[in-house]
């Protein structure tokens, strides 16, 4: 099994505004400072009147809230550039009516008016910088604030509270667009083109940009042309993906910074965790081949002969699993695919569930993934079948071997069919048969390879299905396989644990490939289908009774 780290998320982030600030205007590249200008005002009162008249004069103060200038993060239109040139000349937009109901007016005591005047006059001409808390660097926010004058005193405390409530509220801007606009323009104008991929629209995607459009020519050829042009313009700074949009099954191109693809480091070293899992898996392999240890684990310390008896079976099964992983490693190295250390998963029923191996880099295309995924099961099936046949032909060394009931061969269509073909009438219902233990040990290896080849999630079979039929079909097969295993779990403990393993560790999705559109060559597709077929033969039961009439079905 190979574990790698893809679903599309092309949703735009929503620009949310403070609920108490209805006059927010987003104007990029505004000047970095602002001033509050206060003037003199006159006020008249008629204290004896039933209705106290308050005369307010409104003066607009432009408070420009800026942040450190950084690269623009988004797929801005040409209006962005025009706004930069005209923002210094054009007057700010004024929305006076909506602010009246939102502003806070503080009634100051008459005795504090002179103190307030002195306090506010000292603020006149000072520069006020307010942090907006926006998660989107490079966007400068202009806030139009109406400062309300009352009774020759400016209600500055209310305005300051208003500024604070507006500016301290984080602006939920789209943080997924991290490519500068200049980079996007180069990608659209110089990297993509009529001869490769004609871009019609673009959307944010996982720290980069997703380009929709029309693919020209063969996907593999177009990908290489686009990749070469992008490397000529940006070097190794960005990574290109040519994928299929699951929404409409049309090709899309995705460009993301390579720094966003760096794997996360773990607190526990990989080799240490893999070694720990390997020791536990080796112990469970001993347990499976020594029934006495299953009932009394402490007896192993008193009688080492028990461990000696279980050593051959553990080594044979481990050999089949090791050849399986060796097949993955050899093919991956030939294709330049880096694999992590295998994590052997222990099992109380069959000794081990096989190994989980992480793919550490991006696979180039579906054919490469198919080769790596199919190499392990093909190697494991080949060795397992050879050992299984040897066990059926070679009699037990002690003349007794392992005595089993003939019904045990109903557990596997492949094992039952081969046994009936080679043993003939010696294999009959209701009778016991003496076998070479190598048959049972090799059968365990075949079963582990067969379950790993189920077309589900990130199992080898899941990767094979993805490589042959694409991501959407592989997802459907994963659901069907988990459902069938769930039904089988009602009758088999092994199926139950495999459902748990797949659902929590190997459910997927499979990490995106660099180019997912090109279908693999027919000869590799045939090998992949052969692996899936062998998995089906190993896991399905043998339905025919072991009698002289081979056409007789069990229970009929």
From Swiss-Prot:
Alphabetical keyword list: Chloroplast, Hydrolase, Membrane, Metalloprotease, Plastid, Protease, Transit peptide, Transmembrane, Transmembrane helix
Keyword Ribosomal protein: no
One Pfam family matching this protein: Peptidase_M50
Enzyme Commission number(s) of this protein: 3.4.24.-
GO MF annotation terms: metallopeptidase activity
BP terms from Gene Ontology: proteolysis
Transmembrane segments: 267-287, 311-331, 336-356, 374-394, 437-457, 484-504, 527-547
Function of the protein: Probable membrane-associated metalloprotease that may be involved in chloroplast development.
Protein name from the UniProt record: Probable zinc metalloprotease EGY2, chloroplastic
Source organism (scientific name): Arabidopsis thaliana
């Amino acid at each position: 099994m190979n574990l790698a780290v893809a679903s599309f998320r092309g949703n735009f982030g929503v620009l949310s505004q403070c609920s108490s600030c209805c006059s927010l205007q987003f104007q990029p590249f505004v000047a970095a400072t602002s001033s509050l200008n206060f003037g003199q005002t006159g006020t008249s009162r008629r204290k004896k009147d039933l209705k106290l008249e308050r005369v307010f004069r409104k003066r607009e103060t432009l408070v420009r809230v800026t942040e450190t200038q950084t690269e623009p993060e988004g797929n801005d239109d040409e209006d962005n550039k025009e706004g930069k040139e005209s923002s210094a000349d054009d007057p700010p937009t004024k929305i006076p009516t909506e602010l009246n109901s939102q502003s806070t007016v503080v009634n100051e005591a008459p005795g504090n008016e002179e103190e307030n005047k002195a306090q506010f006059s000292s603020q006149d001409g000072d520069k006020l910088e307010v942090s907006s808390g926006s998660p989107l660097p490079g966007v400068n926010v202009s806030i139009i604030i109406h400062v309300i004058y009352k009774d020759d005193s400016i209600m500055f405390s209310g305005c300051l509270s208003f500024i604070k409530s507006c500016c301290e509220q984080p602006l939920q801007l789209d943080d997924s667009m991290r490519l500068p606009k200049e980079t996007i323009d180069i990608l659209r104008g110089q990297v993509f083109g009529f001869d490769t991929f004609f871009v019609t629209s673009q959307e944010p995607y996982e720290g980069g940009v997703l380009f929709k459009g029309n693919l020209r020519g063969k996907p593999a050829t177009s990908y290489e042309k686009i990749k070469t042009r992008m490397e000529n313009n940006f070097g190794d700074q960005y990574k290109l993906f040519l994928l299929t949009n699951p929404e409409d099954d049309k090709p899309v191109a995705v460009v993301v910074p390579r720094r966003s693809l760096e794997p996360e480091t773990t607190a526990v070293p990989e080799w240490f965790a893999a070694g720990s899992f390997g020791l536990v898996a080796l112990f469970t392999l001993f347990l499976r081949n020594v029934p006495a240890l299953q009932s009394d684990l402490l007896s192993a310390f008193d009688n080492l002969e028990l461990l000696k008896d279980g050593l051959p079976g553990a080594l044979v099964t481990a050999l089949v699993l090791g050849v399986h992983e060796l097949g993955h490693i050899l093919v991956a190295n030939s294709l330049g695919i880096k694999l992590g250390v295998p994590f052997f998963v222990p099992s109380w029923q069959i000794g081990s569930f096989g190994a989980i191996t992480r793919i550490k880099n991006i696979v180039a295309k579906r054919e490469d993934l198919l080769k790596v995924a199919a190499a392990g099961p093909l190697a494991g099936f080949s060795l397992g079948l050879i050992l299984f046949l040897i066990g059926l032909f070679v009699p037990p060394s002690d003349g007794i071997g392992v005595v089993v009931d003939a019904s045990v061969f109903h557990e596997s269509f492949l094992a039952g069919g081969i046994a009936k073909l080679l043993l003939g009438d010696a294999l009959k219902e209701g009778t016991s048969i003496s076998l070479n233990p190598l048959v049972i040990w090799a059968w365990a290896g075949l079963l582990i390879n067969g379950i790993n080849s189920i077309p589900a999630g990130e199992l080898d079979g899941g990767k094979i299905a993805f490589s042959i039929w694409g991501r959407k079909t592989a997802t459907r097969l994963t659901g069907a396989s988990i459902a069938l295993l769930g039904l089988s779990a009602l009758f088999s403990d092994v199926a139950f644990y495999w459902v748990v393993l797949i659902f929590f560790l190997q459910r997927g999705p499979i990490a995106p490939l660099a180019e997912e559109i090109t279908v693999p060559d027919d000869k590799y597709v045939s090998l992949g289908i052969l692996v899936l077929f062998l998995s089906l033969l190993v896991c399905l039961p043998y339905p025919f009774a072991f009698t002289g009439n081979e056409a007789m079905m069990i229970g009929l």
